[in-house]
């Protein structure tokens, strides 16, 4: 079956989320508030949940805390881009991601009035207030909008809707697809209505999953044909990493794959294009100074985006 037919089947089998209309309106308003020359980065982040039941108790989830997407969104904002941040609910978010640990550890009892019995601990005040001030500045000035999702179905419906609305800015759109998207799903008609029972007499659970259509193809060909599109490839086996990235480029014909290994993803990545492979490694000194590799990834993404914008500007 052709990929386009598979895509249509997926959206027919998986009804759109009730919030799709509201999300679409928010994105349209956000785009309309930008200047005619403003570049927009569409950053996706976090994992996607695949339910095993209609009334979901059990599910399959993809590994991702969302730090790469959240950090990258920050660096895009600081580089002058406006950012649409599509993130997994409860995953890390731009600016507020900087504190790691239970949020209750941020506070202590105040010795002041009973109207404000809790205050931010002295050692966290700078981090907390700076993060909140930056987040407030970018959202208040319409430079950052954040849209949450949970399931694979929500993610794909939102991806399609946002991509179609970004068509209006053509090559000024940059897609930075850092979300960990499931390769497999279970169609709703094949889901158990209620919780799968463990005491049914069987000593095993067999789950039949179907491949998710390759929606990157539709981004490139149909949903956002003039945008710059960057995808990520995460593997655990270094012997296949670059080959898998090259296969993705050949299959989908987008601009860049950022390839990384699970064990070294925070300090090493490869920028893979149709012609080159360029490795980036943080030094030991970078690690000590807590330099984030995402600032270099975003810088490379912006350079690529500028080149593509210039190519379209020169086109007859």
From Swiss-Prot:
Q: Subcellular location, in the record's words?
A: Cytoplasm; Nucleus
Lineage, top-rank taxon, reads Eukaryota
Q: Does the keyword ATP-binding apply?
A: no
Q: What is its main location?
A: cytoplasm
Q: Name one Pfam family in it.
A: DFP
Q: Name one GO molecular function term.
A: phosphopantothenate--cysteine ligase activity
Listed under GO biological process in this entry are: acetyl-CoA biosynthetic process from pantothenate; coenzyme A biosynthetic process
This entry carries the following GO cellular component terms, namely: cytoplasm; cytosol; nucleus
Keyword Secreted found:
no
Entry keyword set: Cytoplasm, Nucleus
Which family is this sequence assigned to? Answer: Belongs to the PPC synthetase family.
Q: What is this protein called?
A: Uncharacterized protein C4B3.18
Please name the taxonomic classification of the source. Answer: Eukaryota, Fungi, Dikarya, Ascomycota, Taphrinomycotina
């Amino acid at each position: 079956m052709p990929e386009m037919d598979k895509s249509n089947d997926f959206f027919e089998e998986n009804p759109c989320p009730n919030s799709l209309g509201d999300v679409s309106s928010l994105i349209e308003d956000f785009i309309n508030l930008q200047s005619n020359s403003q570049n927009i980065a569409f950053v996706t982040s976090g994992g996607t949940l695949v339910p095993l039941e209609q009334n979901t108790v059990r599910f399959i989830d993809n590994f991702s805390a969302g730090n790469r997407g959240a950090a990258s969104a920050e660096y895009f904002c600081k580089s002058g881009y406006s950012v649409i941040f599509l993130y997994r609910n409860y995953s890390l978010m731009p600016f507020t991601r900087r504190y790691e640990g239970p949020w209750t550890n941020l506070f202590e009892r105040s010795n002041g009035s009973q109207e404000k019995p809790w205050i931010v601990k002295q050692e966290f005040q700078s981090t907390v207030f700076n993060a909140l001030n930056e987040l407030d500045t970018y959202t208040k000035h319409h430079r950052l909008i954040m849209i949450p999702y949970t399931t694979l179905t929500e993610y794909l419906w939102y991806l399609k809707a946002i991509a179609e609305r970004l068509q209006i800015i053509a090559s000024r759109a940059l897609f930075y697809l850092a979300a960990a998207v499931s390769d497999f799903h279970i169609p709703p008609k094949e889901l158990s209505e209620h919780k799968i029972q463990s005491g049914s007499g069987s000593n095993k659970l067999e789950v039949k999953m179907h491949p998710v259509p390759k929606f990157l193809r539709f981004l490139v060909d149909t949903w956002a044909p003039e945008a710059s599109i960057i995808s990520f490839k995460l593997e655990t086996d270094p012997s296949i990493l670059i080959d898998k990235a090259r296969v993705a480029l050949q299959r989908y014909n987008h601009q860049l794959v950022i390839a990384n290994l699970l064990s070294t993803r925070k300090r090493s990545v490869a920028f893979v294009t149709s012609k080159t492979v360029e490795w980036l490694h943080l030094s030991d000194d970078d690690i000590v100074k807590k330099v984030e590799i995402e600032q270099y990834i975003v810088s490379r993404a912006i350079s690529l985006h500028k080149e593509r914008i210039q190519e379209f500007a020169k086109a007859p």
